[in-house]
């Protein structure tokens, strides 16, 4: 973070690490994590409650946070269905984070969603955060910066961009994230916009696919571990 402050200057706008933000007196910016809707969903007692769980998370969050902490993370159970069924008040939030799937398609869908609800995308913030490198950042900025405010959650390839420098990918970065495995004895599930990121027991993944109308995970046949 210190290196980013010194190297990027005003282009470095904050960190999602609240401890570092407090110690360095910089902006805490980002989203709540996938764990929250995963836990709320695991605690749901019916399919109806399950379908509403991701929005209940944000309703509770709305009561406690504002400004740059009101960033929607829509992909826990598929962005398309999330936006289709989202309450209108959610469009008033500061922005949206794109963390899986095709970032360009997701950005276009976010802009379209805001416009459909009477919001001006030029007053909104899109945060791209899925395995970015410099070339992707430049390309996304060039394509979308005239339509919406763009920012980039740059982590994995920021601290380790040594790809193809050792045989067998021994220096390549790897993804290390924390996910809730269960809540009150019930397994948690994450679907994502990327089928490779799906986690949870197969039986529960099938149920969540049905409830959230996600069709991309039909070929999953083995239990997956949280990641």
Regions found by a protein language model. Name each.
Residues 1-109, 114, 144, 182-186:
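Buried, small/hydrophobic-residue-enriched core segments of structured protein domains
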Residues 27-29, 69-71, 94-97, 123-127, ...:
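Structural preference for beta-strand elements that scaffold enzyme active sites
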Residues 76, 126-134, 154-157:
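Glycine-rich beta-to-alpha transition loops that act as phosphate-gripper elements at the mouths
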Residues 116-121, 146-148:
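Short helix-capping segments at alpha-helix termini
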Residues 132-146:
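Catalytic cores of alpha/beta
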Residues 147-163:
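Glycine-rich phosphate-binding active-site loops on the catalytic face of alpha/beta enzymes
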Residues 161-195, 201:
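C-terminal helical cap(s) of enzyme catalytic domains, especially alpha/beta-barrels
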Residues 218-227:
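Single conserved hydrophobic/aromatic residue that forms the stacking wall/gate
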């Amino acid at each position: 973070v210190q290196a980013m402050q010194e190297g990027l200057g005003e282009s470095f706008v904050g960190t999602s690490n609240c401890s570092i933000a407090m110690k360095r007196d910089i902006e805490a910016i980002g989203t709540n994590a996938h764990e929250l809707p995963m836990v709320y969903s695991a605690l749901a007692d019916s399919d109806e409650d399950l379908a509403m769980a991701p929005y209940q998370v944000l309703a509770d969050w709305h009561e406690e946070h504002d400004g740059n902490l009101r960033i929607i993370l829509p992909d826990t159970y598929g962005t398309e269905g999330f936006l289709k069924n989202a309450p209108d008040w959610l469009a008033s939030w500061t922005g949206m984070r794109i963390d899986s799937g095709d970032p360009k398609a997701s950005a276009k869908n976010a802009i379209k969603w805001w416009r459909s609800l009477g919001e001006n995308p030029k007053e909104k913030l899109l945060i791209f955060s899925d395995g970015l490198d410099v070339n992707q950042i430049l390309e996304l900025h060039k394509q979308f910066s005239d339509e919406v405010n763009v920012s980039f959650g740059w982590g994995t390839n920021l601290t380790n961009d040594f790809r193809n420098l050792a045989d067998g990918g021994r220096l390549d970065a790897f993804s290390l994230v924390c996910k809730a495995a269960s809540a009150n004895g019930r397994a948690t599930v994450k679907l994502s916009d990327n089928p490779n990121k799906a986690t949870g027991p197969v039986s529960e993944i099938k149920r969540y696919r049905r409830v959230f109308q996600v069709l991309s995970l039909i070929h999953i046949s083995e239990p997956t571990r949280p990641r």
